[in-house]
């Protein structure tokens, strides 16, 4: 008989420890573990963490087996793991209806429960009686399910369970936009049951999605049907949001030790090594104590000052918990594991020794880790005075299984019983490793032989869509519908993946379906749903963005392959050449480098061997019965989404396959790809004919009358008239710069239609019948004789509003069959798109209530980056705030309501929201100092800039804005966001162009704009404000011409006039604040009772609830500032607060009670006027803004300099609070 080796003896010791502290509590029927001896319920998260030590010990026994009984122990331990994981699965499967519902609602009451009955797997508390929505708990289960399956364990046993796990993937893939209660089950740290977006949940979901993608849940015994599929774009959304949050944990927690599980074992979710280091350092520096780490700052759990009789805290109570938060040894176990994976032996040794000091010896010398350490009640005041000086007491659960498990696992790894790769078989630990550059493969296809010939003339050899067979090319919308079948399971009543937009990562793969190869075109090329893809320059811009995105975000094996079809809409107007911007882009692609990405162009067949392939086995032939079975039910639901789905790329072969083949999948595609080739119904416009409407009654009036008949009573000046080539000078339009306040007059009541018909016919001189009502038959006749597309749109708008979209228009004569108004509008939309009539396109889009396909995703991207949105033109209540992600239809309805039924403003709002989302993904630095994005105000600023640069009226500027191409609109928005100086000028269109939209050129003026330091003037004034010098001031040349400059030419003062007013107006409109502004406000509130801004008070009590770095505090400050209607006045108030912040840095305990910031600003303005009058300034220079009482030239003064606004503000601030400052003549630190 062999003697027991030393390693075997050590393993036996750990086995005893595992049985005493973990397995001894496992339920023999369900396999679940109670949270502790006292808490009998089984928490999902705790169970997964607690079983990790058992899993690791089983692998260690199998690896270091001395004899057969060691292999038996390994098997027993592994089966204990399997039993627990299956038990958790059964708990969740009993709530399958919630999984199905949550996919669509993402409601806190429709989610899986966080804990279950240990002995029955039943729920233990009501849906609304616990913070059940904890995405990280479901995610850690899926992550470890993937890791354990990859290690050889067989947990999933049938295809129904596979389908359920696939739906769990859908459940967590929206983690980046789901506010939940987080790993501490409290949500917002006030513990008042408010969910929030948690970095720990987003990171764990991202790790789980990556780990389980393309994993066979049956392991070595599986096949294609047991493989899990994850859409890569959802993973990237999580990655983007996580990186934008860290090191911040959530809006209410500026740091959280729970992030250790995200940046290191088990998730390894962050790919930026520097961000990992920063986050870990923040945790150690701000949260670490002598017994472990606090969970987060001001955590009241088990604190001596916590009231155990109340579930929730009072907001001001949180300050009591600061510096006496409980310390948790569990975070040292994470840091031990982190050191092992990072191969940092010093860190491992340091924290192992630290843990030895907080261990408690149990019976027979068993090492136990307590849940946490708390300050004794009688030593609270001492700890307040000297943090980390008091000896603490162990409390909470003993042993704490989650903690005990990670401790044992760390010991097994540190002592060499396990290698890191054995508990991380999916290699997640290499997430921060170097990744080679990605080469993006681009295949350019021609829609038809004619386009192929045009490209050939330019030296570009491409294939048509038909010539690439047997590879089939389809729209991204088809892929979205195909994925609806994924995870479908009738036995469990699971419908599969909800219909959602597929991103460019998902369309850049080859798909193998029933032994055929498919590739899909990117979503941004879809012209049928929204008009952005009608602008060729915008297509180039979106292609640039998507190529850069692919280059930086592609993580799969093989290379991404982007299929780019050149369609008829990408030709010049007469169709005899490819649009120059498209052509130049194709040439750049040929060069091999575009938008910062390495690019390779070739045929699809060439790329097959180097691309990533996904096999969609859920569409195999055995699923034929379910494939077409539910189509009739889904057809009505999805008809609006897919009726215009397929962009016919010429004789592609798709039609041939779909209509000839008897294969049921091909029949399924036939339904999805129903031809959208529209028969032309509208007669051609009759150029040279008179207008249908008299000159004084145009679209402006029609829109207003239509609004009135619907009981909206919308004022005329808030509506919009699209620009037409024959627009008369007196034709009125939207004036974004002079919008009246919402009116609340009486609505029209009875007999609306009849009243409207008579008023409309009389007032607009429309044809009338003998009863005096509108003669719609004659109006239809006039539709055939319209001289412009605009007039056709006007008539169709009247018909749509008064008769409805389904009303049949008999254009071919009585009895010849009619065409619905909706169909005619769609046809007119296509014609306007062909003519690039952007104002008209937006107008018709509004009539049709078109919605950007990615509208909800754009809104979610902005909100997930901690930005709030407002839609509608200010002020409130017309301006509506969006603080949480909304479903697409609800968001669309809200936008139209906030736009006052002004259809063009509503459409433009969607467009700008999409552009903002594009920029926040690609250039997040643009938004660094902005918290709330007010889209209506941004639109007004854009119109202001056009009016200023083009020297035109507000109405003309508004018309020009509405008629900009999408590319120009996005470009103008970027210049406003960037803060750079730019100019706008009219440019001439090519002679052959028939487009009537204004051609506008936007260009940078150069580096004349001030830097951020110059704009705030803080550096120069920091020393000045600390000295109260009463010597008289001498104004400099504010009113004098600027002398000749050294090298950059001569600038007269008149040329500079308005520069700083404009900059303040821009910064105020987009809510841009200086760096560190909110922290300054927090410091000020520490030394006073509150700040009053424009009549609204920000109380100092907010600092007792919130810390300086919290997003919540910044939102609170913005909620006060946003009551200021004038953006330039708001910006001067911000400058005033920054000056106060410098005063607050002085070593004084108080600077007053409630500080009225407006008074400081007006005092500074008075000082400015006094100086100007002393220099005999004329009345023109002393003129005040009537609304605010501030001198216009004070608005337009530079912040820095001896006579800048900051100088006057500093004098005013010191004067206002001088009673609280030191009595010496100079304030010194």
From Swiss-Prot:
Region annotation (Calmodulin-binding) ranges: 825-855, 1052-1092
Record GO biological process: glycogen metabolic process
Membrane topology category: Lipid-anchor
Superkingdom assignment: Eukaryota
Polar residues: compositionally biased ranges: 1028-1037
Keywords attached to this entry: Calmodulin-binding, Carbohydrate metabolism, Cell membrane, Glycogen metabolism, Lipoprotein, Membrane, Phosphoprotein, Prenylation
Biased composition (Acidic residues): 625-646
Localisation: Cell membrane
MF term (GO), any: calmodulin binding
Region (Disordered) location: 625-648, 1024-1050
Disulfide topology: none
Cell inner membrane keyword on record: no
UniProt keyword Chloroplast present: no
Similarity annotation: Belongs to the phosphorylase b kinase regulatory chain family.
Role: Phosphorylase b kinase catalyzes the phosphorylation of serine in certain substrates, including troponin I. The alpha chain may bind calmodulin.
Name of this protein: Phosphorylase b kinase regulatory subunit alpha, liver isoform
Species annotation: Takifugu rubripes (Japanese pufferfish)
